[in-house]
Amino acid sequence: YESDPGTPIMKGGRVAVVGGGNVAMDAARTALRLGAEKVYIVYRRSLEELPARREEVEHAMEEGIEFKLLNNPIEILGYQNPDDRRDPKNGFVTGMKCIRMELGEPDEKGRRRPVPVPGSEFTLDVDTVVIAIGTSPNPLIKSTTKGLEVNRKGGIVVEEATGATSREGVYAGGDAVTGAATVISAMGAGKAAAAAIDEYIKGKEA
């Protein structure tokens, strides 16, 4: 661990985190710790539909994060100086346009589908937007690694006990295998894969 890794961190003053899962809660709370003056969580469903763990939501609320529920972003607004293409402010976020939602009929998973409310658009005054609406494995992994089997969601298929993939000598674990899960789960998969890799190398050297 390095206290100063040398990589600058852009700190937002007013931050919008889009999403309602554990990663969204982590991102919002981290933004506060980095010095943001205001942090919003923007989620298109209601509090009851938030997929994040209850304790994560409660901690975020206790820390002063404002929840913009039943709202959905439709456009990220940015600064553009028409007279100076080299203006260093060009491309910086100036706000996020949203629309209010209401819950309609249930979808195929039984969750009530959010429906836009016509004419309810508004602009949220933010200078930073963090998108935290889900995770999926990078499709480049499969296309650049011959012989690697993936499931229909793009997750790498492995032997559960060892992390061994369909390609000899290649091991995988964490979200690239299971989809969005916890750091603890990924660490466990990493330890199992490390032990299996050690045995694999020893077998090659014998």
Predicted regions and their residues:
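FAD-site-proximal beta/loop scaffold in flavoenzymes
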Residues: 1-12, 106-180
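A structured beta-alpha segment of the ubiquitous adenosine-cofactor-binding alpha/beta core
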Residues: 5-6, 70-74, 79, 87-127
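Rossmann-like dinucleotide-binding cores of NAD(P)H-dependent redox enzymes
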Residues: 28-75
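Rossmann-like NAD(P)H-binding beta-loop-alpha module
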Residues: 2-36
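A conserved FAD-binding loop/helix module that cradles the flavin
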Residues: 27, 176-204
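Cofactor-binding loop segments of dinucleotide-utilizing enzymes, especially the Rossmann-like FAD-
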Residues: 20, 43-46, 175
